[in-house]
Amino acid sequence: MSIRDHSYYMTKAYQEALKAKKIGEIPVGAVIVNKDGDIVATGYNQTISSNDSSAHAEIVALRALGQRVSNYRFPDYSIYVTLEPCCMCAMALIHARLKNLYFGAYDLKTGACGSAFNLISDPKHNHKIIVEGGILKKECSALLSDFFKERRQSKKELKKIIQDFKSKLGSYKHFFSISF
C-alpha cells in the first residue's frame, strides 16, 4: 500500500475517533481492511458508554469483524488505529493474527508497539505483525491533545461553579439553620 492509501484509511479511522469524542469517550478510532482494500470493520472507544473496560477501538473492530466472518483469526487483514495500541489491544491483534498494524499517534505512556513497550514485536510470539506508526501523526495527536485540554478546562470550570455556589450558600447559612 502507498502512503496515499495509508492516509485514506487513517482518515477513516480518524472519523471513527470523532464518534468517540462526540459521546465523551477518549477519541480513538480503528478500521480493519481486507486484502482487496475494502473496509470490513470499524470501531471506536466505547469503554464508558458500554461499561466495558475492554471496549477499546481495536477490540470493538475485531469483535465486529469476527461476527462478520465467523472467525477470530484474520491473517489477510490490516488494522488502522489513530493511537498506538495498549498492551491489551496489542495482544488481541497478535492473537487475531492480523497481517499489518498502522497507527497514527505514538503513546509514550502506554503504547505497546515501540513507544513505552515493544510487546507487539516480542520474539517470544509465534505471530509477527508488520507495524508502521506515525501515519497522520499530527492530526491524530492533535485530536487527543485537544480532547484532554477541553476535558481539563471543563473540570476547572465545574470546580469554579461549585466553589461559587458553596460561597453563596455560606452567606445564606442562617436561612438553613434549624434549631431544636
What is each stretch, according to the model?
Residues 1-23, 88-180:
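Zinc-dependent deaminase
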Residues 71-83:
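Immediate flanking context of iron-sulfur cluster ligation sites
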Residues 28-37:
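Short beta-strand scaffold segments in enzyme catalytic cores
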Residues 49-60:
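A short, polar/charged loop-to-alpha-helix boundary motif
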Residues 24-28, 75:
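Short, basic and Ser/Thr-rich N-terminal targeting/leader segments
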